[in-house]
Every structure is written in structure tokens, then in C-alpha cells.
Design a protein with these regions (language model features):
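Short, hydrophobic, well-ordered secondary-structure elements
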Residues: 27, 31-61
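Polyanionic, low-complexity intrinsically disordered segments
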Residues: 2-18, 39, 100-223
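Surface-exposed polar/charged interaction patches
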Residues: 33-36, 74-78, 95, 99, ...
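Alpha-helical structural motif
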Residues: 26, 64-68, 155-156
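Residues that form generic nucleotide/phosphate-binding pockets
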Residues: 22, 71-75, 203
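Short N-terminal edge-element motif at the start of the domain
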Residues: 13-34
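Generic structural signal for well-ordered, non-membrane alpha-helices
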Residues: 24-28, 48-51, 158-161, 165
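Short non-catalytic regulatory patches outside canonical folded cores
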Residues: 52-140
């Protein structure tokens, strides 16, 4: 690398650091905002900041819900985000059931999910639950949509969507009848999601600096 190119890259890394320093400061401010009873604003901004980082990291994929779930599962810092809530998955697949390829298999899937234990499941457990009732192609079709039933997807639905398109998310979504590894499922609240935001900022900073490219790709498609 020439000296000019090296200097340009060094300047770029400094710019990346400055950008994420600013993002980190914004995230830190949200806690202060929350403490001063501007809780709706704190939750809305927290949801939007994660949305922005997810869109940037997952570019060029433009599926907001998928990207939001993906970044929480990969970088949210809690294994629970990848676990599946059977009722949530059933509700999500019900929205797809009018499509021709789902009309035949959804009733079978729904019956099995409705009688599942009131706990969060790992992906392989849901596969084992459904496998005896579907052929290989049908099972793969369903597996690709498992993300819609994850705990991360519940955060998207109950926190992000409520914040951006409603009147603000509730201050704590609880799961009184559902367990995770034998214990109560933690409530989805500002502090959980804010912790995710802080971790995601750190991860996306590292990806950008280590690759020398914004969010690992500089918003350029590989050739």
C-alpha cells in the first residue's frame, strides 16, 4: 500500500472511530433521557438506533424486520434472542397462511405449535416437533421462517414496531406463563434493549475498523 493510500486509510479509521464515538454518546444520553421521565423518547430512539445499525450491517438486504432480528441474535449478547416462542411462531406463520404454499401445511404446523409446552424452544427442538408431520421440502420451508418466532422477533414486534408506528412500547413486556431453561423469561424493557444497543455499537465499530470498511462492506457489492 502506498504512503498516500496508507494515510487515506488511517484517516478513514479515525473517521470511523469518531462516528461510533458519537453513536456511543447518543446511546449513553438515552439513559439520562429515560431518568428524566422522557421514557417514550428514550425507547423510540433506542429502537431506531438499533434499526439503523441493523440496516447498515445487513446491507443490501432491505428487510427491516429480518435485519433487526438478525443483529439481535448475532450481536445482542444474550442466547435467549435465538430461542423460539411457539405461540409467536404460530401467529407469525398464520400471517403467511393465505399464500398457496402455506395453505396445506399451516394447519398441521399450527396444531403442533399450539400444544407445545409454555417455554422457549431451541431451533432443533421445533424441528423435532414438526419433522414427523412434514416432508423434507416442507420442513425446510418452515425452518427458513423460524426467525419470525424468536425472542428477538418479539422484541422487534413489541418494542421497535410499537415505538415507531404506535404510541411507544410498554415499559416492560412480561411473560408470566412462559419459561426459559426452567426460569421466568426476562421482561423486555428499555434496559434490556439499551444493553443490546451498546453491544451492537461496539461490534459494528470493530467490524468496520478491522475490515477497514464501513460496516464491513463500504456499501459496495462484491464482484
Amino acid at each position: 500500500m502506498s504512503s498516500v493510500a496508507e494515510e487515506n486509510q488511517k484517516a478513514k479509521i479515525e473517521f470511523i472511530d469518531a462516528f461510533f464515538d458519537d453513536y456511543d454518546n447518543k446511546a449513553n444520553y438515552l439513559r439520562e433521557l429515560y431518568k428524566t421521565d422522557r421514557r417514550d423518547e428514550a425507547r423510540i430512539l433506542c429502537a431506531c438506533y438499533i434499526d439503523g445499525l441493523a440496516s447498515a450491517l445487513c446491507w443490501p438486504d432491505e428487510r427491516s424486520n429480518y435485519n433487526y432480528v438478525a443483529i439481535l441474535r448475532a450481536h445482542g449478547g444474550n442466547e435467549i434472542f435465538a430461542y423460539i416462542h411457539p405461540k409467536m411462531l404460530d401467529d407469525a406463520l398464520n400471517k403467511l397462511s393465505e399464500q398457496r404454499k402455506w395453505k396445506k401445511i399451516f394447519p398441521t404446523i399450527s396444531d403442533k405449535l399450539k400444544v407445545a409446552d409454555r417455554r422457549l424452544y431451541e431451533e432443533h427442538e421445533i424441528l423435532e416437533l414438526l419433522a414427523p408431520h412434514l416432508n423434507a421440502a416442507e420442513l425446510e420451508l418452515v425452518r427458513k421462517e423460524f426467525w419470525r418466532g424468536t425472542f428477538a422477533a418479539i422484541i422487534y414486534s413489541r418494542f421497535r414496531v410499537s415505538a415507531v408506528h404506535g404510541f411507544g412500547p410498554p415499559d416492560g413486556t412480561t411473560f408470566d406463563l412462559t419459561t426459559f431453561k426452567g426460569k421466568s423469561v426476562p421482561a423486555i424493557d428499555f434496559f434490556m434493549v439499551h444493553g443490546c444497543l451498546k453491544r451492537i455499537i461496539g461490534v459494528t465499530r470493530d467490524i468496520s475498523k478491522n475490515s477497514g470498511k464501513w460496516f464491513g462492506h463500504d456499501f459496495k457489492r462484491e464482484r
